[in-house]
Amino acid sequence: MSNYLEQVQSLTSSKTSNGVAWGGINPEYAARMRLQNRFLTGLDIARYTASIMRADMQNYDGDTSQYTQSLGCWHGFTAQQMLMAIKRHKHTTNRSYVYLSGWMVAALRSDFGPLPDQSMHEKTAVSGLIEEIYTFLKQADARELRHLFVELDETRAAGGDVDAVLDKIDNFQTHIVPIIADIDAGFGNEEATYLLAKKMIEAGACCIQIENQVSDAKQCGHQDGKVTVPHEDFLAKINAVRYAFIELGVDDGVIVARTDSLGAGLTQKIPVSQEPGDLASQYNAFLKTEPVTDATSLGEGDMVFKQNDELVKPHRLPNGLYAFRDGSGEDRVCLTVSPASKTARICFGLKPKSLISIRSQAW
């Protein structure tokens, strides 16, 4: 039996069992409303789209011609019209995503007006936009399904091929597609990152993109003056996002870990190393330093630390930031972690076309 007819039959039984209270209810109308509102919450959307994105990632790993396209949208209406146009042209929404960049949100969605891409816009601007986009996409579903319901009524009245119309309804493809949502650098520490990630997931995001810049000194990825955080800080924020996904029951949610290390020449702090080769030691190895052979050469407030059995002084700018060695950016893109005797080398995405997903199991 058609799924549509099963819904009608089920609601007809419910009407009978509810007696007078449902006396004015038309079971077929109710079935249509349910089909038009398939996704009741943002979490329903996040779980549904996460499974799509994971399948697409697996397909791409097996065949790189099966790539996806993520098109930027700054309003629910533009997303709606974009997906309706894609579906009309391609007869499918497969491998078509919506991309919400922090740059775009800062420029077009802040109550403060157009802003540079420096995390100065409201924290909830992205989660609000996610909810808005999915509201418009659900509206597109309701609109197209209504046309099919009208076609069904007209076909019945004319004695036409009802089964053909029922097949269209049963195989209707939703306009709900995955959204890749940019959380910038998390808008604060790992706790702030976790709280904001929850808001974004609850709004429907199955994929969150995060970068390794200092949150309160964040710059657009195409600008100079970028300041990165130590590896431990970035991994803590990635895990915070993973915890948010797990808590909300979106276990296969995707995290896009993006680095600005290639173009960033500064760090705000020097992490404390506990043993040679740990994450802090790896990070500090890229600092621009000079050997210290005589304590009298140190100035007021200078700091030194031990590196490879010698004392070195990191190069500190007048603003208190520390510089990395010239040409070390490409090496800083990757790091090695060794949790419980397992070693994993992680290379973070440099730019949109090379973004990779990082799962919490990797560390």
Q: What spans do the regions from the language model cover?
A:
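Alpha/beta enzyme core
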Residues: 2-363
